[in-house]
């Protein structure tokens, strides 16, 4: 079982993936190959993410201990079976709720699929990125980490959609990732 910090250490390195996208509405399937390069980020980079993030009334207090908030830089290159290529790089920071104050106005309930059993050990917090996947600019989401399942789940509310991204480490060299993206419900505040 990996603790919160060890999970992120295990994520570092070069990952090659074969992805399959299922577009339910029109019944299409698309395949692609992606190489991810993941490296840990330094305290200065973590501070930079905090400074550009839209935190509203929330206050993050790491008390100079940036180790409690793991973060990494991700760069990837994807080539689809149609020959289309996409490259992107971003930095992400994971701040546990214990280090965030005045968060009631930013607490968005997770979608039903993302809800977890509260009786087990769970770390919840805010997921900050310097760049969104489907929308440009810094983005703020929520995460949960379940050590017993070695599973990180990130929920991001974009303007028009919601993405629920789940990453599970099965073994040191194998991870499973599922991303479900759907239209954002109109009753969720921005």
Predicted regions and their residues:
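Soluble ligand-binding/transfer domains with enclosed cavities or grooves
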Residues: 4-190
């Amino acid at each position: 079982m990996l603790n919160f910090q060890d999970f992120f250490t295990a994520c570092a390195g070069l990952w090659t993936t074969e992805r399959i996208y299922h577009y339910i509405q029109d019944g299409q399937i698309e395949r692609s190959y992606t190489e991810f390069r993941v490296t840990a980020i330094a305290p200065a980079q973590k501070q930079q993410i905090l400074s550009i993030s839209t935190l509203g009334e929330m206050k993050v207090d790491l008390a100079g201990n940036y180790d409690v908030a793991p973060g990494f830089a991700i760069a990837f290159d994807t080539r689809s079976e149609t020959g289309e290529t996409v490259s992107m790089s971003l930095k992400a920071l994971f701040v546990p709720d214990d280090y965030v104050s005045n968060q009631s106005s930013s607490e968005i309930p997770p979608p039903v699929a993302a809800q977890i059993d509260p009786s087990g050990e769970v770390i919840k917090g805010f997921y900050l990125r310097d760049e969104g996947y489907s929308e440009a600019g810094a983005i703020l989401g929520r995460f949960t980490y379940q050590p017993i399942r070695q599973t990180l789940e990130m929920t991001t509310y974009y303007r028009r959609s919601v993405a629920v991204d789940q990453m599970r480490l099965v073994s040191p060299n194998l991870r499973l990732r599922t991303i479900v993206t759907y239209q954002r419900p109109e009753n969720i505040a921005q």
